[in-house]
Amino acid sequence: MFSKSFQLMTQGKSLKAMEHLSEVSSKISEGEFLQLSNENNVTLKSSEYIKIISLKTAELFGAAMKVPAILTGKKNQEIVNLYKLGINFGIIFQIIDDTLDYFGDKKTGKEIGKDFMEGKVTLPIILLLKKVSKPEYMIIKKLFTKNKRNQKDLNLILSKLKKNEIKRDCLNYAKKYQIKSEIILNKYDNKQSGLFKDLLVSSIQRKN
């Protein structure tokens, strides 16, 4: 994708767009490194999680909004607004994806517990650890320090996530970024913003 984008921008002689994609490529690499270095880290904070997914995932969405705006000669403020919308949408997308890893449906093709089995600490686990008792915290921590986790371990986590209503908490967390996006979209007329607002809602409600 990046090589094709660079080719098109070279033809269009858009140095600004090329510089941004180069920056995005660097940020994605940083995000991947941060995620790998935080595997099994149950002390990961929600702010650190957001930083990781912003770099690893949301920057791609931001670029998808920003680069076309640059190439079509949009004003600077509109480029900034579109970039922010892309970032917010990317964060929502990843939060929901990580939530569905625990609350998805196998019938829709979602493999349940993949992140847990790989030792990835994502938002559902971060929010769960804020709610559980100290003994429960230590049990969950022990599960993440194991070399291998099994279905019994996953079932324990799933029961605690359900008991503590973590799906609701994750959706509410994602909705914060929906609200941020709607504040930007309200600056535009309904025809321009309506479709994107619908997309925000459907992304939070998606099942797989």
Range-by-range predicted roles:
Residues M1-I139, K176, V201:
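Mg2+-dependent prenyl diphosphate-binding active-site environment of isoprenoid biosynthetic enzymes
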Residues V132, D189-N190:
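Juxtamembrane/membrane-water interface recognition
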